[in-house]
A protein has these predicted regions:
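Beta-strand-enriched, solvent-exposed domains that form extended recognition/catalytic surfaces
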Residues: 28-140
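Sec-dependent signal peptide cleavage junction
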Residues: 19-30
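Bacterial N-terminal signal peptides that target proteins for export
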Residues: 1-9
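Bacterial N-terminal signal peptides
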Residues: 11-20
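N-terminal substrate-binding region of glycoside hydrolase catalytic domains
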Residues: 77, 123, 129-289, 293-301
Length: 301
């Protein structure tokens, strides 16, 4: 190849790199304005989310407003979305209220909210996301926690009732595996969808847990996510079945996984609230989600 041709190719490559760099810089445009969410609370009427929003800095390159976006657990960024839930003028400090939508497909209880600006084409986040910090106010069971009479406890299986009574423990831990509970016989509606649970398994837990409660024994549930061929959406997205894994990480990275996982937890919390006659008023006082979360074989992903 002649020297002039090599030079031309080098120059052409340099031009291409410069153009690419320019586009990259444009795409990664930063703004001088920042925004923050001071608080994110369920309102006193328990039907709104009240969000305190403030901002400061130069609004150059924006339309002079701060927009508020809702992100579900399976959404990592605003992306190309335009469906903001509220907006305020830049530089203002205001509290905006949006519907909580509890009990509907648009339920915002598990969502987080992020402030953004608009440059005429794209919305860009300019502050940290914020979750609701008082979700407990909409819990159906508002009873105070009952402290066990003694710290003496036992991690047991369902067939170890007599051991617990003989040893005089006042605190037991029970394992609950996701795969056991899904099935048929009990229909449960949550946020507009119907989910199906294994009636015989649920009733077995009802009997055991209510028996403990009758003996004034506090119950802690350890909820475990074992592999379920019928419901692969429950396992963290992208995870393959492994012979070396005992349990898997819960999946909230996809919409289907999040919604099913949320419904199972809601069913368990409702069933074992101590106020549900269907479970003979069985009550679980403490919940542990997962086991040894920093150990791969126990929370594989």
């Amino acid at each position: 190849m002649k020297k002039w041709m090599k030079t031309a190719l080098v120059l052409a490559a340099a031009v291409c790199l410069s153009v690419a760099a320019a586009f990259t810089a444009l795409a990664a445009q930063t703004f001088q304005i920042t925004a923050s969410i001071g608080s994110c609370l369920i309102g006193s009427g328990q039907n709104t989310v009240d969000i305190s929003l403030s901002s400061n800095g130069d609004t150059t390159g924006t339309d002079g407003k701060i927009y508020l976006f809702e992100l579900r657990p399976y959404e990592s960024e605003i992306g190309s979305r335009t469906d903001y839930v509220s907006s305020v003028g830049a530089g203002e400090t205001r509290t905006v209220s949006i519907p909580l939508n509890k009990g509907t497909a648009q339920d915002r209880l598990y969502s987080r909210f992020v402030p953004a600006v608009f440059d005429g084409t794209t919305f860009t986040a300019v502050g940290a996301a914020h979750y609701i910090t008082n979700p407990e106010v909409v819990a159906s069971n508002q009873d105070a926690f009952k402290t066990p009479l003694t710290k003496k406890g036992l991690n047991i299986q369902l067939n170890m009732l007599n051991d617990a009574f003989t040893l005089g423990v006042k605190h037991v831990a029970v394992n609950i595996a996701f795969s056991q509970f899904l099935g048929s016989g009990i229909d449960y509606e949550y946020d507009g969808k119907t989910y199906h649970f294994n009636k015989s398994v649920v009733e077995n837990y009802d009997k055991v847990i209510s028996t403990y409660i009758g003996k004034d024994i506090s119950v802690t549930a350890i909820v475990l996510n074992d592999w379920n061929d019928a419901h692969p959406e429950l396992v963290h997205a992208g995870t393959a079945k492994s012979s070396s894994a005992n349990y898997y990480m819960f999946n909230t990275k996809t919409q289907e996984g999040f919604e099913t996982t949320r419904a199972i937890f809601a069913f368990l919390a409702d069933r074992y609230s101590g106020k549900n006659h269907n479970s003979n008023y069985a009550k679980i006082s403490n919940w542990i989600l997962g086991n040894e979360i920093n150990n791969q074989i126990w929370n594989y992903m």
